[in-house]
């Protein structure tokens, strides 16, 4: 059973199920999945996952949605899996490490600004769906110019930017949830002129990937014979 999450319902119009409400969030219950619309931004994404996981068992979770493409990154309209998220607006310009304390500590492992998604689940999905993997960058404030986007991409080695991924990845680590992230590139990061965006193509790529994921999940659950 998948817990599916997206920042907005705009990114999930293809999902069909029984509407329900969970605390402050709206969602759907369908075959092989529960879906929640988290709302935009880091706090919303982390709260939705943590609140749901506190009251319900979560086998695996997928955050999916649109993202901005950095120069040299994935093509517009392409869907990719995110293997690691960078929280680029936490701490100093160079991150938390110069300050000497982590954002998250699990045993001997300390995480500063980089948070991996579940590598096994991500690899499994990449092979099954035939998708590339990339490094994502998360900020509550998106890039407003191409120059700003390029500087962030170079500083952190990221291929795309969004507003939720690092919070989701960090919450998954803290809660022990196997998490994966799927993003489709709708626009060049830092370009606000929507004439250069490819939102329709990106939404179609998201729909294809999530539908295939759910179809394969259904096949895996179907008894032989």
From Swiss-Prot:
Gene3D superfamilies for the chain: Nucleoside phosphorylase domain
InterPro entries reported in the protein's UniProt record: FL_hydrolase_MqnB, Nucleoside_phosphorylase_d, Nucleoside_phosphorylase_sf
Pathway involvement of the protein, from the record: Quinol/quinone metabolism; menaquinone biosynthesis
Keyword annotations of the record: Hydrolase, Menaquinone biosynthesis
Catalytic activity: futalosine + H2O = dehypoxanthine futalosine + hypoxanthine
Gene Ontology molecular function terms on file: adenosylhomocysteine nucleosidase activity; hydrolase activity, hydrolyzing N-glycosyl compounds; methylthioadenosine nucleosidase activity
SUPFAM superfamilies, A to Z: Purine and uridine phosphorylases
Pfam families to which the protein is assigned, alphabetical: PNP_UDP_1
Modulation of this protein's activity: No enhancing of inhibitory effects are observed with divalent metal ions. Slightly inhibited by hypoxanthine.
Quaternary structure note: Homotetramer.
Record's function text: Catalyzes the hydrolysis of futalosine (FL) to dehypoxanthine futalosine (DHFL) and hypoxanthine, a step in the biosynthesis of menaquinone (MK, vitamin K2). Is highly specific to futalosine since it does not accept aminodeoxyfutalosine (AFL), or any structurally related nucleotides and nucleosides as substrate.
Entry similarity comment: Belongs to the PNP/UDP phosphorylase family. Futalosine hydrolase subfamily.
Protein name: Futalosine hydrolase
Organism annotation: Thermus thermophilus (strain ATCC 27634 / DSM 579 / HB8)
Organism classification: Bacteria, Thermotogati, Deinococcota, Deinococci, Thermales
């Amino acid at each position: 059973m998948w817990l599916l999450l997206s920042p907005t319902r705009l990114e999930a119009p293809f999902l069909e199920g029984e509407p329900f409400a969970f605390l402050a969030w709206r969602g759907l219950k369908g075959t092989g999945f529960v879906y929640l619309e988290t709302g935009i931004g880091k706090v919303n994404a982390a709260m939705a996952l943590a609140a749901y996981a506190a009251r319900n068992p979560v086998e695996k979770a997928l955050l999916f949605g649109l993202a901005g493409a950095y120069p040299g990154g994935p093509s517009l309209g392409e869907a990719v899996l995110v293997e690691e998220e960078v929280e680029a607006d936490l701490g100093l310009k160079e991150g938390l490490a110069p300050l000497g304390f982590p954002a998250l500590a699990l045993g001997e492992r300390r995480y500063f600004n980089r948070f991996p998604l579940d590598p096994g689940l991500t690899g499994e999905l990449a092979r099954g769906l035939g998708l590339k993997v990339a490094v994502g960058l998360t900020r509550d404030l998106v890039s407003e110019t191409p120059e700003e986007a390029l500087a962030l991409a170079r500083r952190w080695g990221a291929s795309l930017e969004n507003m939720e991924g690092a919070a989701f990845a960090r919450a998954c680590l803290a809660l022990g949830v196997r998490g994966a992230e799927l993003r489709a590139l709708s626009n060049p990061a830092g370009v606000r002129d929507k004439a250069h965006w490819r939102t329709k193509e990106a939404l179609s790529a998201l729909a294809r990937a999530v539908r295939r994921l759910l179809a394969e999940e259904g096949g895996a659950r179907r008894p032989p014979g």
